[in-house]
């Protein structure tokens, strides 16, 4: 099954950069306290070997996420053929990333040009994905030169974690924390306030 219809029109504008309006700030997630289908989550990151500190934080959040959903962390080697040309490097990384994205995955691309969302909207994103009919959510963190065209086109949603460019290791840690925070929002737990 291929997911070709965008599950949520307010989140699928690939390069919109609108921040939440003042009316949206302080609002609650529309799925809070409701049953949400917990899809397995896969985070696909392009990069090199992770630092010990990042590995420890990722492992900590994997444990925290365990009660909510299954989680898989996949690392795609950056510049696998040591290409000198940036375009060739991005294409090689893209091929490896696309092999990890299933045809029925709900794909979230993290990109500096993506939509700026808050924590409640991230929780809603998880709820929307759970209601989409997809079998898994795949979050894609690109390499030093970003994502290739195929990955961008495959995205159901394109978001950014910050207006600043983040190193892939920092982006991974921020994403992991936000995934945990999102689940606590969905479950009405006290972590988020």
Curated annotation (Swiss-Prot):
Q: Which InterPro entries match?
A: Alpha/beta_knot_MTases (IPR029028), RlmH-like (IPR003742), tRNA_m1G_MTases_N (IPR029026)
Q: Name one GO molecular function term.
A: methyltransferase activity
Q: Which SUPFAM superfamilies match?
A: alpha/beta knot (SSF75217)
The protein's UniProt keywords, in alphabetical order, are:
Methyltransferase, S-adenosyl-L-methionine, Transferase
Source taxon at top rank = Eukaryota
Q: Which CDD domains match?
A: RlmH-like (cd18081)
Residues given in the record as S-adenosyl-L-methionine binding sites: 110, 142, 161-166
Instruction: List GO BP terms, alphabetically.
Output: methylation; rRNA processing
Which EC numbers characterise this protein's activity in its record? 2.1.1.-
> What Pfam families does UniProt report for this protein, alphabetically?
SPOUT_MTase
Q: What's this protein's family per the entry?
A: Belongs to the RNA methyltransferase RlmH family.
Task: Write down what this protein is called.
Answer: Putative RNA methyltransferase At5g10620
Natural source organism: Arabidopsis thaliana
